[in-house]
Structures are given as structure tokens and as C-alpha cells.
Amino acid sequence: MSKRKPLVVVTRKLPDVVETRMMELFNTRLNATDTPMGRTELAEAVKTAEVLVPTVTDRIDKAVLMQAGEQLKLIANFGNGVDNIDVETALSRGITVTNTPGVLTEDTADFTMALIMAVSRRIIEGAKVIGADNSWEGWSPTWMLGHRIGGKRLGIIGMGRIGTAVARRAKAFGLQIHYHNRKPVHPKVEEELEATYWESLDQMLARMDIVSVNCPHTPATYRLLSARRLKLMKKEAIIVNTARGEVIDENALARMLEAGELGGAGLDVFEHEPAVNPRLLKAKKAVLLPHMGSATIEGRIDMGEKVIINIKTWVDGHNPPDRVLPSML
């Protein structure tokens, strides 16, 4: 590897082992307080950094990128999704963008199944009865009844790495696998999962018992689950989202939950994080969690290792392995 040590600015606190390695390899400026950078701080960072390492909480938009100095040549995103970055503007200014695909697949798929179980079996409600409410009066044949998931139809929106991993887990639980994607997956994968492809999202939504959102947030998927589409779902159906909050019309979802027009929702992501739609907070049939889907020690370290490899490869004069291309957006 080249002995040159580029100035790398990291916007958030990363696992200690990752930060230690980055300090060894690069001229690294860390965020010791883990306080999210404001707009002014981000603008200052891009004026001096050769490499910027942002996270999902950092909005690297055109306004920020237009203030970047000529030395900024790589944005090594600490995350799989790149909807926090104006990739088109970055590329037009000769800035390479990378992400960390693959390493969060299993963790997010595990969490998706946990949300399905939490909503279907009312697990969070039960925990509150024992804990915060302390109102449990003993077992009853008709108390706290949820729904069996075995044999139900699961509709997966977005059959990429995470969607496919969810399907494998769901099949083991006895769910029938259905999916909507830009195109069908490989026939061998369909055969393995006994999965049914739906070209029409509308038709799939109307027939599913459970819907799992696993697609990225892009201009094409912004509020993909609109009020009109949500109304197509069965009254007793549930929806879980471990992708991005922007994919669902949150106000429409809240209205339907309030009116009893949906069986429940499990949400780990929100459109205006960390703010959460007040109507969702009041919805009795909603399980709301603070963007924990990929939150494992192993996953965060793996993400950091991906970032380091991307930076090292770039320093050595090669294309980073996880370069984001226009065709991927």
C-alpha cells in the first residue's frame, strides 16, 4: 500500500476497533462526541477532507457538495443505502461514492422477522403488562391473543440481498413467499424459496397477510406505499418496514391504524428521523423501534472494515470494490 495518508474526516463515532485501525492507516479526524454534524460543520469538513466518511444521519446534498474543495475525491459512506448523498452531484464533481453492501443483510433480515413476530404475537404489549404497567392478573384462555404466522402469505417488496434473506427465514417459519421486484429473481432462487413473483404490486398487496418493505429509498420508491396502495391491503394484514421510512406514506398508515383498517404495523425506520410521526406514536397496533435493524456489534465492525477497504483501495489508485454507479440508483 502507498505510504500516503489522506485526510479522512469521520462524521460520527464508530466502533473503537474501527477507529483505531483508521488512525493507523490514515490521517483521520474523528468525531469524539458522536454529536451529528450540522450543516456548517459538514460544509467545513468537505472543504478540507480528501475522504469523507458520513452515515445515514448526514445529509450530503448538492448545497454541501458545491462547497467541497478539489481535494475531496471519495465519500466512503458508512452504510448500505446512499439516499443521504446526492450521488449524481458527487459524481459530476469527480467524487467517487462507496457504500457497505452485504454486511448488514443477515442482521436486518433477523430483525425483520422479529418485527413480524412482535406485531403478530403482540410481544411488546405483553412485555409492557409485566414491566411498565404491572397489570398482569394471570393467564386467561382469551387474553392477549395474536395471530399464527405459519401458513400466511408474506409479500416482500424488494427481493435484493435483504429481501431474499427474509424470504429464507420466513420459509422456515412456514410462510408462503411472494415478492414484488423490478424483475424476477433467478429461477433457482424462486425454486429454493418456493416464491411467487408478482409484476403488479397492487395485486400482490391485495392478497397478502403480511407485507415486508425491503427496497431502497430512491425517487422511484418515495411513498411507494401510498394511501391508495395501503387501502388495497386486507383489513387484518400487517406491514413491517426495515428499509427506509420514506417508502411509506406515514400519515396514511397512521390513519388506517387509527380506523382499524389494518391489523398492525412494525416500523424500524421513519421519514423524518429521529422525529417520529405523532399519530404513529399514538397508534395502538404499531410497534415502533429506533432504527435498530442493523444494530449488532459484528455488523458495525464489518461496516467499518468495508469502509477501510474502500479507502485503502482508492489510496492505492484502484477503483474501490463497493463503488456506487449511476446504474445502481
Model regions: which residues?
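Rossmann-like dinucleotide-binding domain for NAD(H)/NADP(H)
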Residues: 93, 97-98, 111, 222, ...
